[in-house]
Amino acid sequence: MSQWTHVAAIFRLDSFGKISDESIYKAFGKEVTWDDLYNYDESDDTKTLPMGSEGPLEMSIWHNSDEGCMASTTVSAFGDLRDYGGSDIDKLKDWFNDCCKQFMVRQAVMHVIDEYADEPIIVQYVE
């Protein structure tokens, strides 16, 4: 039987000016499609979003249209990771904290449900 881990994370980022999508993908990791998995090259060291056996989390980027607002960007990462749990959760926490270190974070939280754990895990950014 498969082990599933369900993830919902949101990052509210502050900036002076626009944060480029490229810098977000560089910090968070790129999304990988099923075709990318089929042609996956282990020597490729490009950072990816956290990944289970059937693929990674998905990511959505929203930019505030009011360019004068400090709360400029919201990034959400979400999905269901198969064959991922237990000690992998520490890697997920490290990923979350590494993402937060790259930007001025107004607010960030991640809710994780490991189907084999007793309780959900909530990780929040604290400066």
Model-inferred region functions:
Residues 23-40, 44-127:
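Charged interaction segments
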